[in-house]
């Protein structure tokens, strides 16, 4: 079972923060509670409810916590399609959402995957400050500002430092420019 949880806050001041060198830019997903814990708790509750209804079964929730191919599963489950920036896009919600999976040993019907809808758009590719989207659907993590500011152990390579601007934790440029995100739904979460 693949699920999504919106995280776009009502007061998402992307441009004003990025344009103000006195402020540090933090990726939108990191502004609220730890989504790993929150979504995992909800998936566990869903598993418990399914078990209460169906009887004994095995299940395990995953939220970016194991080598589970979340995007591939979400695409196959019909949550959306893989955009050229390599994120899942949804016609009604854009890409501002988290993914989670509940692996379960219960046969369930499978939803139809959505067709790719990016067409000729290359906005995410051309806006990437470091050229990390090296081809449609291909991101070179070693160039991605999100990787460089969150995952990289050690110093950020000198060639990328001027391109960071005031980004101190993550980068949302490819999502901000994506036309599908004009349909994004605000989060129901209060933080």
Sequence positions of predicted segments:
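Short helix/strand-bridging catalytic loops that position acidic/His residues to coordinate divalent metals
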Residues: 115, 147-162
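Phosphate-binding glycine-rich loops and adjacent basic patches that engage nucleotide phosphates
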Residues: 1-13, 86-91, 127-143, 190
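Iron-sulfur cluster-binding cysteine motifs and their immediate structural context
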Residues: 123-147, 153, 167-190
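Immediate flanking context of iron-sulfur cluster ligation sites
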Residues: 110-119, 160-171
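A sequence-level detector of short, solvent-exposed, charge-rich linear segments
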Residues: 16, 20, 69, 121, ...
